[in-house]
């Protein structure tokens, strides 16, 4: 049973990371998305 919950947690973490990465890339490319808090946390300066 613990193995299943571990796999689910890994999947959730991967999904969250992918979503954050997509937002970060859009911010860097100057997309329509306003600079997210993640960009500020990573020390990326927005223009």
UniProtKB/Swiss-Prot annotation:
Keywords: Cell outer membrane, Lipoprotein, Membrane, Palmitate, Plasmid, Signal
Domain of life assignment: Bacteria
Main subcellular localisation: membrane
A GO-annotated cellular component: cell outer membrane
Membrane topology: Lipid-anchor
Record-linked InterPro entries: Lysis_col
Lipidation feature positions (S-diacylglycerol cysteine): 20
Range of residues in the leader sequence: 1-19
A biological process from GO: cytolysis
One Pfam family named in its UniProt record: Lysis_col
The UniProt record lists the keyword Lipoprotein: yes
Subcellular location: Cell outer membrane
Role played: Lysis proteins are required for both colicin release and partial cell lysis.
Name of protein: Lysis protein for colicin E7
Organism of derivation: Escherichia coli
Gene: lys
């Amino acid at each position: 049973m613990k193995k299943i919950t571990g796999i689910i947690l890994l999947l959730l973490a991967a999904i969250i990371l992918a979503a954050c990465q997509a937002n970060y890339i859009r911010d860097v490319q100057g997309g329509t998305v306003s600079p997210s808090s993640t960009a500020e946390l990573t020390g990326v300066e927005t223009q």
